[in-house]
């Protein structure tokens, strides 16, 4: 009795809510064996035939390829695609693909050479001798993807299962009307399918392996039972025919009684599902060493004269397959890729066959019926009763039309499997699946944009944080350098302070002039020569400055007066005039004032900075030079004394010179002269006294 209950519990199946029973229409194509189709002259192989990114190209235009040669490299979810036959790559360009929008995707276009030569194939007949990782990598690199319609990379799916998979389910339900590709494959290749299932079981190591098949496929059931007669590791479960029992979540619930949670995956409850076509492709990749280059495609509908299932090479144009099946198009003929409920209408027939293409339906006008006008929703809830995912299609319809994305997401629109059961039962002929597809696409686009914005924000915040860290580190370095200067900086500071103190000491040192001594004026002379050179350079740089000198220059007048006096004295000496009186001190003072005025005016004209105060030692040197010149002039002109100079006349000339100097300073807008230095006055007085004494002595000598 216990064994009886165990057997009953072991073979128990469950049911799911909703579902419909549309006309099956499978007998048109499942009665004839699989057949080969002649090679097309040209193949179009899209680089993306799966869920995920397209692979990296590894061929170029003009390359010759063999059947099974990789056209792209697969990394991660980037599944590679392979050449369906031997030939030459004539173009790599966008081409319309198998998609409801008929968007153009990058494709490799190959002209077949008709030889259909394979690459060198290396099969692993003893696959158990290889590791799990090696088997998964081989399956991935040979381009195996889910052939049931989703197109998810099989290697990635097996890798993600890991050790948490307890049940492996092989989906053989094929519940949609018209499609018989899996049915015919199980009838003709049951042994190869079972071998592929065992390879998958070897990789996953589940506790049980279940094959779910609907009871409307008696021939396929018989073939599988014959192959599994002596097998105890694989169980065959026959389930009632009901659409959409072939859905992943629905078949999982039927065979295990477990429901996949909202937003979750079947692996969350320890279940992994593969299609029978995928199991066959796994066997060919591992045991035979053949990448996936072809698949079974159902050609059916009343518009074709020879319906059936064919081995179609990937990249073959749809037009080529339909013509081989005797396609007789009508005026408004449509061609559907997929089934009547989940398929989509092709915009033209140059679309290529891809890995997820399982059926090409060419119905007649009578078969499809007259087009129905879309009407308003009457809230009958028939769609909710038929929904196998326990959703509320009528609410999702309103949310989709109103662009209420948040509410549509809250009502689990992502769980919609787009089976079309709701649209099938809708009395208002509302294409609900089209609304749901568009809404899900918009939600995905919004999420993608939000993800990109979040990534951009993260990058910006990371950059700001990095800049703040660099700024803080820079300030810390500057602060540390200011608090603790380097040794060489301290030495430089000490040297600068020493120079400043030395200059201050020199400035405060009094000037002492000893009678009869000759001071060392070499430094002063060198500085004066440097200033003269600087003044000459400035005059050369500003040649126009000389032209601005007014005609009544006091210094010029003084020079002319001095020249005139010298000429007069020379004339008197030649004529034998009276002896020259002693040099008047006031005249010497006048000459010194004139010299200072000339220096200030020269500095104003050249735009230089104000002159430094006159050094007493400099005045002494100039006086000594003047005396030497006077003595030399007297020696040259003879011993006769010159006519004495009138003191009042010299005073008047000095006053006139001072008045002209002050007037010139006012006209030029210069700053007032600095007050006379007491030391300078003392020096000038001493010089005058010395000159007077010397003149008196000279006069006495002349009289003697």
UniProtKB/Swiss-Prot annotation:
Q: Which domain of life is it from?
A: Bacteria
Chain spans, region Disordered: 535-684
Q: Where does [4Fe-4S] cluster 2 bind?
A: 387, 416, 419, 422
Which Gene Ontology CC terms are recorded? Answer: plasma membrane
- Among the Pfam families in the record, one is RnfC_N
Its membrane topology is listed as: Peripheral membrane protein
Cofactor(s) the protein requires to work: [4Fe-4S] cluster
Enzyme Commission no: 7.-.-.-
Query: Which molecular function terms from Gene Ontology are attached?
Result: 4 iron, 4 sulfur cluster binding; electron transfer activity; metal ion binding
Question: What spans are recorded as compositionally biased (Low complexity)?
Answer: 556-565
Biological processes per GO annotation: electron transport chain
Cofactor: binding comment = Binds 2 [4Fe-4S] clusters per subunit.
At the top of the EC hierarchy, this enzyme's class is translocase
The 4Fe-4S ferredoxin-type domain covers 368-397, 407-436
Q: Which UniProt keywords apply?
A: 4Fe-4S, Cell inner membrane, Cell membrane, Electron transport, Iron, Iron-sulfur, Membrane, Metal-binding, Repeat, Translocase, Transport
Query: Which residues does [4Fe-4S] cluster 1 bind?
Result: 377, 380, 383, 426
Where in the cell is the protein located? Cell inner membrane
Family to which the UniProt record says this protein belongs = Belongs to the 4Fe4S bacterial-type ferredoxin family. RnfC subfamily.
What quaternary arrangement does the UniProt entry report? The complex is composed of six subunits: RsxA, RsxB, RsxC, RsxD, RsxE and RsxG.
Q: Per its database record, what is this protein's job?
A: Part of a membrane-bound complex that couples electron transfer with translocation of ions across the membrane. Required to maintain the reduced state of SoxR.
Q: What is the protein named?
A: Ion-translocating oxidoreductase complex subunit C
The scientific name of the source species is: Salmonella paratyphi C (strain RKS4594)
